């Protein structure tokens, strides 16, 4: 009995360590998924704003059924979509509003992470691939039954992607046969967004972008005045004005004072009779 107790005592730490290792691997996979969603969402936002295509969107373009990525009028990324029995990692929807027959393409993406992409085809990766393919086929059937009806062609394209946990570098891509259905892609986007259980948090605004926004919102300063040889630098120069017309000068001379100032600017002496009288005179 003592030996049995010792064996049980020895076996407990091993079981605890295996559970700890499994939990550690699971948390590492969750962090990799979150970082992947963030990087993918950044590419989608940049493409919709600037039409610049990133690495992940270029990878998705292989499922667009011969269409160019730049023909898409809008790209939407929806993460962790709750389809009931299944929850695909993310669905990337490409809308083709200018196409007469094609409404859009829904790329159903299942993500698998691995420690290293240089380890080759291991037993763990083969198991992940088998599991991922089953998950994609199940998600495809569920999405077919939930798709809103419509009169345009919509392609459902399942894709399995392996990435490295640290670098998020894509190591392997497996595409299943796409399914062609009739539906409404705009209504499908709204439906998928309502079923999403994870929203990618907005990225914090960088210091450089804040400066750029503040510079565009701040009114421009007037140009600095030129240096005055008499030491009047830093004082704003008087605003330039058009030279007065003769009629205006005549009217000002009758009021007195203005003609004298104009004559002083051109170094022209003014007759004594045109000088305005002051109290000292």
UniProtKB/Swiss-Prot annotation:
Coiled coil: none annotated. Keywords: Host cytoplasm, Host Golgi apparatus, Host nucleus, Late protein, Virion. It comes from the Viruses. Residues 236-246 have a biased composition (Pro residues). InterPro entries: Herpes_UL24. Induction: Expressed late in the infection cycle. GO terms for cellular component: host cell Golgi apparatus; host cell nucleolus; virion component. Its main location: virion. Residues 199-252 are annotated as: Disordered. It holds the Pfam family Herpes_UL24. The keyword ATP-binding does not apply. It is found in: Virion; Host cytoplasm; Host nucleus, Host nucleolus; Host Golgi apparatus. Belongs to the herpesviridae UL24 family. May participate in nuclear egress of viral particles. Plays a role in the dispersal of several host nucleolar proteins including NCL/nucleolin and NPM1. Since deletion of host NCL/nucleolin negatively impact on nuclear egress, UL24 supposedly acts on this process through its effect on host nucleoli. This is Protein UL24.
